[in-house]
């Protein structure tokens, strides 16, 4: 007679006692048990049920959760996204910034009424989620972070806190929602998903793919893409119509001389070492070598200085002045890659600046001033690229940035949020002519095509 299998949760893993075969598990001869990472919980349960294997489930310890019946109305594409996800209750929804990914997730919570852990990149995003989740009842909303540790039916945590406490959280929630899910494949963060038994999983992002290819891991620990829309699909109806204007700006003569000097050092190093840059990994080898190879270090410094010159050119500042004059009645967000240019623009044009150094209180005050019209422009490094709700804006200016699709789409999304009476949005890209920034802009352009 077959012994009834017993399932336990132990420190991010599932332990099964009994003589039944357990898929995805390894047998531990010392304890006579099978052990698997906790995310295999659903697979193991389904295997036992489909094969008529009796079992006792002592793994789950879910937080008691009420039945939710909030009024949540969805747009047509949000309904389709939710329907696709509900088929298996696993997978990632890819929607443009400003199109209501959070709204879809809240509808999923409403459908399942099960203890839910929402994982977000920043505390600022945690605050936004807690506010939105209030429609289910503030008494059911908690935060588990470095500053607060409360487990409620709907708990919001940062990736950092969820990773550090993955073992503790692993059997308390049945639904995991990963906001900005492209962060999850990092070697540390992926353990949040691997060490949880949650049978239901939802990933949200505007850009699913990662340049390092690690997004493939999401298919196993969260689920693949179940629904995807790009900005052009929603422009004019659910998002503002937009145009992209690329302006090529020459370097000043003194900048040109310095740029070419730095570029020469870098290219001579590549030729001397026979290095051809085809992928990000090729450049990363130079970065690694710079720790012990003086020539590699000098080449990397020359490359960084050349980029700084291209990103921060004087003529870009002059062109920005023209754009600010042209759009003096519009709301403008200026994006840069580095804080140095943020503070320079803030000082020259008396525009409020938001960087990682800006306190939460000051950031909220600036964004409120932007919302009410007290400020018509703000300038930021990468802080506003992701997650933070930015008030209505219809003009964006990219002073400098990377060539990644994610950064581009997120910056574009900042000016596409629909609002009453909003006219066509404009995104300017200022590019230093004859520099490596041209190639960076080309990659952004390709990203734009992919978003069409």
UniProtKB/Swiss-Prot annotation:
ATP binds at residues 95-102. It catalyses: Couples ATP hydrolysis with the unwinding of duplex DNA by translocating in the 3'-5' direction; ATP + H2O = ADP + phosphate + H(+). PROSITE patterns: HELICASE_ATP_BIND_1 (PS51192), HELICASE_CTER (PS51194). Residues 251-312 are annotated as: ThM region. Residues 1-60 are annotated as: DRD domain. A motif (DEAH box) lies at residues 179-182. The record marks 283 as: Wedge residue. Conventional DNA helicases unwind DNA by binding to a ssDNA overhang of dsDNA and then translocating on this strand with cycles of ATP binding and hydrolysis to 'unzip' the dsDNA. XPB is believed to be an unconventional DNA helicase principally because it translocates in a 3'-5' direction along dsDNA instead of ssDNA, thus it is referred to as a DNA translocase. This is DNA 3'-5' translocase XPB.
């Amino acid at each position: 007679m077959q012994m009834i299998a017993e399932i336990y949760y132990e420190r991010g893993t599932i332990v099964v006692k009994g003589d039944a075969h357990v898929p995805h598990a390894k047998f531990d001869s010392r304890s006579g048990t099978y052990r698997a990472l906790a995310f295999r919980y659903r697979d193991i349960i389904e295997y036992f049920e489909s094969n008529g294997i009796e079992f006792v489930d002592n793994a789950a310890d879910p937080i008691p959760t009420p039945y939710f019946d909030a009024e949540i109305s969805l747009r047509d594409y949000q309904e389709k996204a939710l329907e696709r996800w509900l088929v298996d209750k696993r997978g990632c929804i890819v929607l443009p910034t400003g199109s209501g990914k959070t709204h879809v997730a809240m509808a999923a919570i409403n459908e399942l009424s099960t203890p839910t852990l929402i994982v977000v990149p920043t505390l600022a995003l945690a605050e936004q989620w807690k506010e939105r989740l209030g429609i289910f009842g503030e008494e059911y909303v908690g935060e588990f972070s470095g500053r607060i540790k409360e487990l409620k039916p709907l708990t919001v945590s940062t990736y950092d806190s969820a990773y550090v406490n993955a073992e503790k959280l692993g059997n308390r929630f049945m639904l995991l929602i990963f906001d900005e899910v492209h962060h999850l494949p990092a070697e540390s963060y992926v353990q949040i998903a691997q060490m949880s038994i949650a049978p239901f999983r939802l990933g949200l992002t505007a850009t699913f793919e990662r340049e390092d290819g690690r997004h493939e891991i999401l298919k196993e620990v969260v689920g693949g893409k179940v629904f995807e829309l790009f900005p052009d699909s929603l422009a004019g109806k659910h998002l503002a119509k937009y145009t992209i204007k690329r302006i090529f700006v020459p370097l000043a003569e003194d900048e040109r001389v310095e740029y070419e000097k730095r570029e020469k050092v870098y290219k001579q190093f590549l030729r001397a070492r026979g290095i051809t840059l085809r992928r990000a990994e090729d450049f990363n080898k130079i970065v690694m070598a710079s720790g012990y190879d003086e020539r590699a270090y000098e080449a990397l410094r020359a490359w960084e200085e050349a980029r700084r010159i291209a990103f921060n050119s004087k003529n870009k500042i002059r062109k920005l002045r023209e754009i600010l004059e042209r759009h003096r009645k519009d709301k403008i967000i200026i994006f840069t890659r580095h804080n140095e240019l943020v503070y320079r623009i803030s000082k020259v044009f008396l525009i409020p600046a938001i960087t990682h150094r800006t306190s939460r209180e000051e950031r909220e005050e600036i964004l409120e001033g932007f919302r009410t019209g007290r400020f018509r422009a703000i300038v930021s490094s990468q802080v506003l690229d992701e997650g933070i709700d930015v008030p209505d804006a219809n003009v964006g200016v990219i002073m400098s940035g990377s060539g990644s699709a994610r950064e581009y789409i997120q910056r574009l999304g900042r000016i596409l949020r629909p609002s009453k009476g909003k006219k066509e949005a404009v995104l300017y890209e200022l590019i230093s002519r004859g520099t490596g920034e041209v190639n960076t802009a080309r990659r952004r352009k390709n990203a734009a095509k992919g978003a069409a």
